[in-house]
């Protein structure tokens, strides 16, 4: 098995969905790769940092366990503000460039930048019968009520909602 940052570079090299699924299938048995994908693609996991520096080190080797332990501090907000910034800089200093820029940094910015989504990963895991799934959180978008006049019966007050909230209805005495 390749290192996760090498896998990401391979995934970047081709835009074919089938190619990406093949590469993911070959490497999804790795717990490190699974955990990294989950941290990156799970929309409910946030790190609370906006700027993640690039790495210029040619030497270094940050162990996955160390990264995960420190990432948990960011997720749980035990490190915030300057302490979080300093923690991230310490992680950068322990890593080498490929390792940090192509794997750890991309997890923290929540973007693998290789054309892989949670849907692709979940499809591959399902095909392999793995007990692994990245949660998918999709917002339902609002539709124009004017296109569905039959659904609104009687008199009512209507307020446009553009944020995805569908409807709040108050029913008095069982009648609409």
Predicted regions span which residues?
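N-terminal nucleic-acid-engaging modules of covalent nucleotidyltransferase systems
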Residues: 1-176
């Amino acid at each position: 098995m390749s290192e996760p940052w090498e896998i990401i570079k391979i995934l970047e090299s081709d835009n074919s969905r089938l190619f990406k699924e093949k590469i993911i299938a070959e490497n999804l048995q790795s717990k490190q790769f699974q955990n990294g994908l989950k941290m990156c693609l799970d929309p409910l996991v946030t790190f609370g940092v906006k700027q993640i520096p690039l790495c210029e080190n040619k030497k270094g080797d940050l162990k996955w366990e160390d990264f995960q332990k420190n990432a948990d501090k960011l997720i749980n907000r035990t490190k915030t503000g300057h302490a979080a910034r300093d923690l991230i800089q310490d992680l950068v200093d322990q890593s080498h460039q490929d390792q940090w820029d192509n794997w750890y940094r991309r997890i923290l910015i929540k973007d693998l930048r290789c054309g892989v989504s949670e849907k692709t990963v979940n499809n591959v895991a399902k095909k392999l019968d793995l007990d692994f799934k990245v949660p998918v959180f999709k917002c339902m978008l609002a539709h124009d009520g004017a296109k569905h006049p039959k659904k609104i019966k009687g008199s009512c007050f209507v307020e446009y909602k553009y944020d995805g909230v569908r409807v709040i209805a108050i029913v008095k005495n069982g009648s609409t």
